[in-house]
Amino acid sequence: MHNPKRVVIVTHFKPDADALGSSLGLAGYLKKKDHAVQVVTPSDYPGFLSWMPGHKEVLAVNKDQADSLQRAQQAVANAEVIFCLDFSSLNRINSLQDPVKNSTAKKILVDHHLEPEHFADFEHWDPKAASTAGLVFDLIDKLGDKNYIDADIANCLYAGVMTDTGGFRHSNTTQKEFQTASELVGAGANPSFVSKMIYDTNTIARMKLTGYVLSQKLTVLPEFHTVYICLSHDELKQFNTQTGDTEGLVNFGLSIEGIRLSVFMYDRKEEIKLSFRSLGNFPANEMARKYFEGGGHKNAAGGSSQLSLEETLQKFLSILPEYKEQLAEDGEEFELIVKKTNGKNEK
């Protein structure tokens, strides 16, 4: 990397703030080092990330743009170096999986997820790291190039650190994350601006979807210290759901006292997607990996199912007894209050 190279940065399907922020932050740094850089994503990114500097240059595979896949694949084919950010398995990049796998370019993995496939030539991998954005910052720091981090790069990286720690609230938040955030603020990151753009720029449709989910779709299973939410494809269409609109819905369940596991499943038509969030020592990633072709972190994981939404729900309910003791550990006892409201049971 001492000489200018054609660089492609690839991140996972449905990129979140850590995926896009780390990618654009790294891209900004590499451009300052005179590399020709193209960020490629295997799908669109959420609208609430469209403030990130450099987002307009992202080449996103979009089903509504017939040539976007071809252009993305061509960019990968032309690359001399490919950075793979925020994913440890090639199946996380969908239609770009084979182009990246078959590329003769040098591949560099920067990631913090468990059980990497080790497909890259070089790895900057740490499963104890809270975010990929934090690892990108560490990489730039270790190269002695912190002075290259300007406000644009800092804001992108700060967004990744902030969101993957749940606003510095999750158990993965350590002194290291605060130190990284402090250095990024020192380099020009604006915490209040980043927080507002990510958390406080909801559309009316997204707010109505959130209200509907919380009032009609959230189900509590007190005996398992568990909450689940199911959304059908028709329900998603009803609220004109856009990329990113369901982001964060799974987290609401964990705000209920005594809940240790929250699961959100929704019908994407071609498959059922599941998001898992847990508290304490409950391994959400093990459940996702064992039963739903997924994985991730101990307290934040994802999966999928080829069954129908109803069949997926029944499968999930059938396996909960297996985890009853684990879910009860350190769980606070609480009562489920049921009252009649307009002839309906309100939980």
Segments from the language model and where they lie:
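Hydrophobic helix-and-loop "lid/oligomerization" segment in the mid-to-C-terminal part
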Residues: 2-13, 21-53, 60, 71-73, ...
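Short glycine/serine/threonine-rich phosphate/pyrophosphate-binding segments
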Residues: 17-23, 90-94
